[in-house]
């Protein structure tokens, strides 16, 4: 459960991401594909090379979903319901992959926002991404 301090930390940190959200989303995906090659199996139709338009496009989708979650932090299940349905029923993404992407997002944010990435912000973002992952996997059951 996100505390009021966690929610503030997440909103402040995501606000600093600003116009780079899509770029950071794509970078996190690239990190995931390189670090966890089995995740590539969900994207057989993508050009997964560095800087590809498809990875950038999906990175923007990831970032947009996170922006939506930040904006609806008190009602993520409702806000992310369609995305949860998509990943559970159509795409059938293994839930462990959300944890892998979350880790890569944290690494990416730490690399780009070192001054802002304090231990408290790190913990809050980790809890937030775990909450997003829980919502996205809630319809698997």
From Swiss-Prot:
Domain (Globin) ranges: 1-141
Chain positions recorded as O2 binding sites: 58
Modified residues (N6-acetyllysine): 16
A single MF term (Gene Ontology): heme binding
Entry keyword annotation includes Phosphoprotein: yes
GO BP annotation list: hydrogen peroxide catabolic process
Location of Phosphoserine modifications: 3, 35, 49, 102, 124, 131, 138
Disulfide bond entries: none
Binding annotation for heme b: 87
Family per similarity comment: Belongs to the globin family.
Protein name: Hemoglobin subunit alpha-1/2
Organism, as annotated: Macaca sinica
Classification of source organism: Eukaryota, Metazoa, Chordata, Craniata, Vertebrata
